[in-house]
């Protein structure tokens, strides 16, 4: 295949991905948590959710700071995050193309197949949008894999792997896990090919770059926030269980999360080819570096994902680097089996890509069907949490849009000394510019370190106790709420002494009606345009 044709097909993959991601074109509620930190960083020089009380309720330092820098030039994060996510995803397509080219040769037509598969993937396209750091982390990991492969022929290339993995580790907490996998892959390959037990100069430089960048940052954030790990770790993966059986439930949910990934991506049908693709007997070749690095990463990353229960967001943003690994492995497997017969190989590739695209078109369609005005307890499957745990993109979209609408409508109703207990610390506090903490404890060190794990759901294992929540002396309790379609509020099913239910009419709410009932302290004498009296 000519160079021109390969680049033309890569450009087609890029166009497919951009169009595919625009079908989703949303920002999920969790992204707005980082946006609050970005705004406080840009406007006040503080990486905190509530000014004056730094709590590390985010795990994406580099992404949060980057969005904050764009806010300094008046570009809002709900725009910059989507543009940057798309650019990072396009970078991943190019790096994947380059990686396969390194492994199979400059003229190999197989190099364009993996980017096309990624562009067609519903999960990859969904989280190209979404507003999260997912694609920044993925492009950094893919860049590190490219450096690992390139180092077979140019040993100095391994140095940039250390730099990229340092930034990856400042973007997602799984970064050090990737560093261990790729570092082990490089060390073992060198050991097998050179019989040298000690790392070489280039490997030492790579380690120095990693530690020199990541180490000072780790020390700074420990000093700044007071704990060695992010607050989200203590909320999601630390502490005793109220019921010890919940630990097993989390692992079972992790296996289910992995199974859904295998079935939705149709990778379950291509596992034999992926296994064949990850076999490379000659340890001196770039192909061995690629397949060994991919295999080691999968062996540590997937069990880790299972151990924490997977994720509560649909379409697998939590294991996005595995999309790249899977695409590469499948392509290498197909090349191994059919590569000697070019015409057969071409037919197999066309059929594989078209069949995959058809399944992903249907998945994207169902993932983006509107959930407006639905009763989610009895509604269609695309609006109900899968297995009671994994929220669909369709639900995430309508949930976030409603919280953004509430925040905008109530922004001018808050006083500087008001404090809120929130159900989600995302779009609602971002647009309302309110102070508060979420009942799950993501931005509360009190809940993170003071409450046990009581819910077997990924990312939401803790729920603030009444005593710990009351210690904040809140003015509003938004975690106790109802959305409804008539002015008369239904029973809330929860209550606080000294608080009263408040009902607001907020035009534009989509989920279950335009009326929103929550709790406010009676002594606040709360009034706001739109209050139903």
Residues covered by each model-derived region:
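Membrane-proximal envelope and lipid/glycan-remodeling enzymes
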Residues: 1-533
């Amino acid at each position: 295949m000519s160079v021109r044709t390969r680049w033309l097909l890569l450009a087609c993959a890029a166009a497919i991905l951009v169009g595919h991601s625009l079908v989703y074109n949303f920002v999920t509620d969790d992204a707005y948590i980082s946006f609050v930190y970005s705004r406080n960083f840009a406007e006040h020089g503080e990486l905190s959710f509530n000014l004056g009380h730094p709590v590390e309720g985010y795990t994406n330092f580099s992404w949060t700071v980057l969005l904050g820098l764009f806010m300094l030039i008046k570009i809002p994060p709900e725009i910059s995050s989507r543009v940057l996510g798309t650019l990072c995803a396009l970078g991943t397509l190019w790096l994947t193309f380059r990686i396969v080219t390194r492994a199979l040769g400059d003229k190999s037509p197989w190099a364009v197949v993996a980017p096309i598969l990624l562009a067609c993937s519903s999960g990859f396209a969904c989280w190209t949008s979404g507003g999260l750091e997912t694609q920044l982390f993925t492009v950094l990991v893919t860049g590190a894999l490219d450096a690992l492969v390139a180092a077979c022929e140019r040993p100095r290339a391994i140095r940039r792997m250390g730099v990229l993995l340092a930034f990856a580790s400042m973007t997602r907490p799984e970064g050090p896990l990737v560093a261990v996998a790729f570092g082990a892959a490089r060390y073992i390959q060198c050991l097998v090919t050179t019989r040298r037990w000690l790392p070489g100069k280039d490997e030492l430089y790579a380690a120095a770059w990693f530690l020199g960048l990541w180490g000072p940052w780790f020390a700074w954030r420990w000093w700044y926030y007071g704990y060695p790990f992010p607050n989200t770790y203590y909320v999601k993966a630390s502490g005793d269980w109220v019921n010890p059986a919940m630990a097993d439930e989390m692992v079972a949910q992790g296996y289910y999360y992995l199974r859904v990934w295998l079935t939705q991506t149709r990778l379950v049908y291509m596992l034999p080819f992926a296994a064949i693709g990850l076999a490379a007997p000659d340890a001196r070749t770039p192909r061995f570096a690629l397949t060994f690095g991919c295999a080691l990463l999968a062996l540590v990353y997937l069990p880790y994902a299972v151990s924490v229960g997977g994720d509560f967001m649909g379409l697998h943003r939590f294991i996005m680097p595995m999309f790249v690994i899977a695409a590469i492995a499948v392509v290498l497997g197909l090349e191994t089996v059919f590569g000697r017969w070019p015409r057969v190989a071409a037919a197999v590739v066309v059929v594989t890509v078209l069949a995959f695209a058809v399944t992903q078109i249907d998945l994207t369609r169902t993932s983006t069907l509107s959930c407006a005005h639905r009763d989610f307890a009895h509604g269609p499957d695309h609006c109900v949490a899968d297995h009671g745990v994994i929220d669909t993109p369709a639900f995430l979209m309508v949930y976030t849009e409603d919280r953004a609408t509430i925040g905008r409508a109530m922004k001018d109703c808050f006083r500087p000394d008001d404090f809120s207990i929130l159900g989600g610390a995302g779009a609602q506090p971002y647009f309302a510019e309110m102070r508060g903490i979420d009942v799950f404890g993501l931005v509360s060190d009190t809940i993170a370190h003071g409450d046990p794990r009581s819910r077997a759901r990924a990312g939401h294992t803790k729920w603030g106790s009444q005593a710990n929540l009351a210690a904040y002396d809140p003015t509003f309790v938004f975690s106790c709420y109802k959305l409804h379609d008539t002015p008369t509020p239904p029973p809330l099913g929860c209550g606080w002494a000294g608080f009263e239910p408040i009902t607001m009419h907020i035009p534009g709410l989509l989920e279950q009606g335009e009326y929103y009932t929550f709790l406010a302290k009676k002594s606040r004498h709360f009034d706001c345009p739109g209050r139903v009296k």
